Amino acid sequence: MNAADHPELPLSAAATERQRLALRFGWLALAVVVSALLSLYVGRGDLADAALGARFMSLRAHRSAVAFLAGAALSASGVIMQGLFRNPLASPSILGTTAGAQLGGELMLVVLYVVLGNLAPAGLSAEMFTPIGCVLGSLLSLIVVLLLTPLRASPVSLLLTGFLFSSLFASLSALLKSLVQESWQLTRVLNTLSLGSVSGAGPRQLALAAVLVLGALLPAWLWWRELDVLMSGEEE
């Protein structure tokens, strides 16, 4: 007996493997949710005031939700780039988009705080413009890397080009910080952007993160079959 006599065997094996992966993913997702909920109740002290405790729980819930969305965006972006460029080593940090996004966000903050004197359009704050700078910086950095990489170049050449520009953008970011170091407030904001923080996350930041992350993940979810085909390569 072989697979040719029973063509359904490979299909059933593939279905079983998908079920196993789905089960593992389900358990991991459940573990993440349970861990996030338990983290809300872990702390160094106990708040006796019920109103203050409710307020504190609300703050921690917003921060946990924003951190969850940020982690989902980082993991999804890595998988998407691995599929698009057909290389398991591809990632936003290697291709330069992470450094480009950081530089774009920092330039936006410098323009708002130094050039415009923190003058943002009515109804909008500086923090609302930071994601715009990050998105523009990441897109421009990726476009530059793709334009400077030969059309028929190997994926390794693309990764090397991205790594070079990632170092260049990181150097420009360090130069920008050194130029504005006399303003300790702006320097603190730039360092917070570089290192990442959810300390100031609230309902508005959560809504903004949800729109950006879910809006980007929806097309990726709809094109998951195409990404799988790209990741499989020409031989398979």
Located regions from the model:
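Alpha-helical transmembrane segments in inner-membrane proteins
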Residues: 2-236
